[in-house]
């Protein structure tokens, strides 16, 4: 009965049968399309575009367009998409995620919806995780599109602005997620409209969509300049932390990675730094530096969380095992690690622009994705991106043998067993892929195999340049490859001659990842396109994940049975416990990403407002009306603050108002107290505003309209950019401290939204006030030029594969005066440096 109900109510089955129907319709056109000459096939593109102009939709063209691409693919590449690939293509066109197993031809599948959506002329972005894959796919699949008369662009990190603009102007653009995000941010920092490179975001197809929209979701892309801060405290805090003893002076929680000073540790800190109370407001910075130094020593491990390369601390991505060059830990943690490793400490940077992948990709009109593993994250894709996950059946049934986990008592026993298993398979020539979770594990297994005299390749964050080549060779007879996590995604492991007879590729997992998806990716490397294969995970009671669900009890049970370290157990109960532990961790990670998105949405709304207004500024030929509105708003606020409604008119501070108006808008004597005495606030505003407009007209007559228009743009852009930059910084500080509100029985998110909104309103008011003041009071120089508010921008993000020499991080240009942005200004005005001389330097 339940089976019948499932068939009736399972939406996936209904969706698949609908896709199958479409695939059959496309397949039915095969014979007709085959008869067309190359010229007639190319002509179809022009015909489709004309039909779209006459009012047909892309949905109306789907069946014919897919059939045309299918035939073009056969003629150009020799590959003819299977029916299941047609179904995957329909899923992508509908803005869903096509879950297709490894080796099922995802790249070819994407060509059909990409072509169909590119016919509108609005541009389609095909997104991959690294530049190697973007270049490869643009080269291989681009031939199909060019054969059909569409243009193809490849957007790389090394391109100039003109080359990028050309790449984005193409019908189809191949790029990495990082480059798309950074180009968007850079476009919203340009000073002239002609410098922008992107078009409005229309349709994107993301390859390895789970990696980009889930694993990378919390990673903000940041463009930054540098703030001058002393590095001395990092060195002092590091020297102090080295003297502390674990458990006695500080506590460390493995699960949360939380590090805390004990009472004894606090007393030691106070003695070491010669202060009375570590938590005195004056010692906030010291407290912060000690906390970060402590985290660097206790929670961050070399060759697991980061590696040291060429005198730089480089983060290791815990999901992909790749090095993330150019990306830095925030909040001073990176500097603390540099101090720990005895490296040169680099200054903290000032954020100029930032966005997360979650928010960038949600700006597209339509978004689709493909991957081999997405079903476990179905809820997240549905809730956050409004995308359904559709599991596309394989072209041939899966013949892989997924064996139950083997569980050992200790790590030592487990690794010995792994080395033994690899040795036995190597003896008969069966290729083996060993998957590890950390760089140090891959190096440990490498040592064990060396001792046994087994030649092998190690693929981890330290040598990803040769990644694709190593992975391609991993299916050859006698090949042994050790890979950290899923390095090498996007490259197929094809079986060499005689390997099928040996049982195909053997995949050995050395521990379970906290995400089932990563485990499934590792399994999926074997048994592609119906090939034979075997997968086996080796676990130990000392593994990170096993500790989380109470491995102590199981250890005690094994001791009672007198089990030694060389005998594994195959227990369904333990395997189920591991899976439920993974589900719990996945749930926690989803909640964390969802919460981050709620916080990030506050900044997203503000960013959209600022970027929209900023674009209007650079797009407009005449800003005078916008500037006049700003002046009026600023004036209304000034009048309201000096003539409060709750006070009697005789209590109003008219002297103060006259002084402010003459200082900020008019000149000495521009308005007298007698002019406004006895008038209502509205009348006062009108009178003063009329005089301001007269002065504005005189100024325009003096300098000429053309120079005045450029002057307005210079002022508005500078004020918007400076204030927005400070605002991002302030919002970040607010975000860091807001969780403390939970202790005060308030909802931190609600507080963040309310305070963030108030701060945003204050920022807009500050922009209006300063624009009004500068436009009315500043004199125009002859060499009028728009200029960036901070020189020396750098981008913090992942490296571009195989592009190391281009990766040399540009050191931002520092201002000549070595003074912090929030320090008192050196001119003696009493204002903060950033609000005084720092504004013009």
From Swiss-Prot:
Residues 798-807 have a biased composition (Basic and acidic residues). GO terms for molecular function: ATP binding; metal ion binding; protein-exporting ATPase activity. ATP binds at residues 85, 103-107, 492. Residues 790-814 are annotated as: Disordered. GO terms for cellular component: cell envelope Sec protein transport complex; cytosol; plasma membrane. Its main location: membrane. Coiled coil: none annotated. It is found in: Cell membrane; Cytoplasm. Belongs to the SecA family. This is Protein translocase subunit SecA. The gene is secA.
């Amino acid at each position: 009965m339940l089976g019948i109900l499932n068939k009736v109510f399972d939406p996936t089955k209904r969706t698949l049968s609908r896709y199958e129907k479409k695939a059959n319709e496309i397949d039915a056109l095969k014979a007709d399309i085959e008869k067309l000459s190359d010229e007639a096939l190319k002509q179809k593109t022009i015909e489709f575009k004309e039909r779209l102009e006459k009012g047909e939709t892309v949905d109306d063209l789907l069946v014919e367009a897919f059939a045309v691409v299918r035939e073009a693919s056969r003629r150009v590449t020799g590959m003819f998409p299977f029916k299941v690939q047609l179904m995957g293509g329909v899923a992508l066109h509908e803005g869903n995620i096509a879950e297709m197993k490894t080796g099922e031809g995802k790249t070819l599948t994407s060509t059909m919806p990409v072509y169909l959506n590119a016919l509108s002329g609005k541009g389609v972005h095909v997104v991959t995780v690294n530049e190697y894959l973007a270049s490869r796919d643009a080269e291989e699949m681009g031939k199909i599109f060019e054969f059909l008369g569409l243009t193809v662009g490849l957007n790389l990190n090394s391109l100039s602005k003109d080359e990028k603009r050309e790449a984005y102007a193409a019908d189809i653009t191949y790029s990495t997620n990082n480059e798309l995000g950074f180009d968007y941010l850079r476009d919203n920092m340009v000073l002239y409209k002609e410098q922008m490179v992107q078009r409005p975001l229309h349709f994107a197809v993301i390859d390895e969509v789970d990696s980009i929209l889930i694993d990378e979701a919390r990673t903000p892309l940041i463009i930054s300049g540098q703030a001058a801060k002393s590095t001395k405290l990092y060195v002092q805090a590091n020297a102090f932390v080295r003297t502390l003893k674990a458990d006695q002076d500080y506590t460390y929680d493995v699960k949360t990675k939380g590090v805390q000073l004990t009472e004894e540790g606090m007393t030691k800190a106070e003695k070491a730094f010669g202060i009375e109370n570590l938590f005195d407001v004056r010692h906030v910075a010291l407290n912060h530096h000690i906390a970060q130094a402590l985290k660097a020593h206790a929670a961050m491990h070399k060759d697991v969380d980061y590696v040291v390369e060429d005198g730089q601390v480089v983060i290791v991505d815990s999901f992909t095992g790749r090095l993330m060059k150019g990306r830095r830990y925030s909040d001073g943690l990176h500097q603390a690690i540099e101090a720990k490793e005895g490296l040169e400490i680099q200054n903290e940077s000032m954020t100029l622009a930032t966005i997360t992948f979650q928010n960038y990709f949600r700006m597209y009109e339509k978004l689709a994705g493909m991957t081999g593993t997405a079903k476990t994250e179905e809820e997240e894709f549905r809730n956050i991106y409004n995308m359904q996950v559709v599991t596309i059946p394989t072209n041939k049934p899966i013949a892989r043998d997924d064996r139950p986990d083997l569980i050992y008592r200790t790590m030592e026993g487990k690794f010995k067993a792994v080395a033994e298993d690899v040795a036995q398979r190597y003896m008969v020539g069966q290729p083996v892929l060993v998957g590890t979770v950390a760089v140090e594990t891959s190096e440990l297994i490498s040592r064990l195999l060396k001792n046994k005299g087994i030649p092998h390749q190690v693929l981890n964050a330290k040598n990803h340049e040769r990644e694709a080549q190593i992975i391609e060779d991993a299916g050859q007879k006698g090949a042994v490859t050790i890979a950290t996590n899923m390095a090498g995604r996007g490259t197929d492991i094809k079986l060499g001659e005689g390997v099928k007879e040996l049982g195909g590729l053997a995949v050995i997992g050395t521990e379970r990842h906290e995400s089932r998806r990563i485990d499934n990716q590792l399994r999926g490397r074997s048994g592609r396109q119906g090939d034979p294969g075997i997968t086996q995970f080796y676990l130990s009671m000392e593994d990170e994940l096993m500790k989380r669900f109470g491995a102590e009890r199981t250890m005690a049970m094994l001791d009672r049975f007198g089990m030694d370290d060389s005998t594994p157990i195959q227990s369904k109960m333990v395997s189920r416990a591991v899976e439920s532990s993974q589900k719990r961790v996945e749930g926690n990670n989803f909640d964390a990403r969802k919460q981050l998105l709620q916080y990030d949405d506050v900044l997203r709304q503000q960013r959209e407002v600022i970027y929209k207004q900023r674009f209007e500024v650079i797009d407009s030929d005449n800003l005078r009306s916008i500037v006049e509105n700003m002046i009026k708003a600023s004036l209304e606020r000034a009048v309201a603050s000096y003539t409060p409604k709750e006070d009697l008119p005789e209590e109003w501070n008219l002297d103060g108002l006259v002084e402010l108006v003459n200082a900020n808008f008019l000149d000495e004597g521009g308005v007298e107290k007698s002019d406004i005495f006895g008038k209502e606030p509205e009348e006062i505003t009108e009178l003063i505003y009329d005089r301001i407009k007269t002065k504005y007209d005189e100024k325009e007559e003096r300098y000429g309209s053309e120079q005045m228009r450029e002057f307005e743009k210079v002022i508005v852009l500078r004020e918007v950019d400076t204030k927005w930059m400070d605002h991002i910084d302030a919002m970040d500080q607010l975000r860091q401290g807001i969780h403390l509100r939970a202790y005060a029985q308030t909802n931190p998110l609600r507080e963040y939204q309310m305070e963030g909104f108030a701060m945003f309103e204050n920022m807009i008011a500050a922009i209006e006030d300063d624009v009004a003041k500068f436009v009315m009071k500043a004199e125009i120089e002859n060499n009028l030029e728009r200029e960036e508010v901070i020189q020396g921008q750098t981008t913090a993000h992942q490296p571009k594969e195989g592009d190391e020499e281009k990766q040399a991080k540009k050191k931002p240009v520092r201002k000549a005066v070595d003074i912090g942005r929030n320090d008192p200004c050196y001119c003696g005005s009493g204002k903060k440096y950033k609000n005084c001389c720092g504004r013009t330097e």
